[in-house]
């Protein structure tokens, strides 16, 4: 493996870790209605587990309500069950094939819990970044050991890997800070 491919692979892995964090943060409730809140809802139907978005259309008519329009009338109770099982703290109110999910106002205590959870997600992502960095550095050591890299090249590339890790770590910090502000805004 050449060094350019190695750097590209490390960057792709770090980008994936950042996307996972972004997806996890979108799932945190901020007190505002967002269709992303229901991304984790799975409905057991037709003998398999199906994402909610494949059995209903989801909309946000206002900042405090999510509407779930179920396409198949026989699925309404299964969709309700899926929303309840997802443990999002939302109480479904059914009206025919329309399920309304009023978004409760977040208490100060709940906001602090969500901020802690966001920080945990951030720390988990940073651990992933450090593991990716470690793997990259081990690969560089192998290349040096096999006389493909000189000691100076190894040192220079290690610094580049560290800089890449620092850049992504800063992106994690800024994503967490932004989410924290979003959560704490009343």
Swiss-Prot record:
Family annotation (Gene3D superfamilies): 3.30.1360.40, Ribosome-recycling factor
Pfam family, one: RRF
GO cellular component term of the entry, any: cytosol
GO molecular function, one term: ribosomal large subunit binding
SUPFAM superfamilies for the chain: Ribosome recycling factor, RRF (SSF55194)
InterPro entries (alphabetical): Ribosome_recyc_fac (IPR002661), Ribosome_recyc_fac_dom (IPR023584), RRF_sf (IPR036191)
UniProt-listed CDD domains: RRF
N-terminal signal peptide: none
Keywords linked to the UniProt accession: Cytoplasm, Protein biosynthesis
Intracellular or extracellular location(s): Cytoplasm
GO BP terms, alphabetized: cytoplasmic translational termination
Entries under NCBIfam families matching the protein: frr
Protein role: Responsible for the release of ribosomes from messenger RNA at the termination of protein biosynthesis. May increase the efficiency of translation by recycling ribosomes from one round of translation to another.
Similarity section: Belongs to the RRF family.
Protein name as catalogued: Ribosome-recycling factor
Upper classification of the organism: Bacteria, Pseudomonadati, Pseudomonadota, Alphaproteobacteria, Rickettsiales
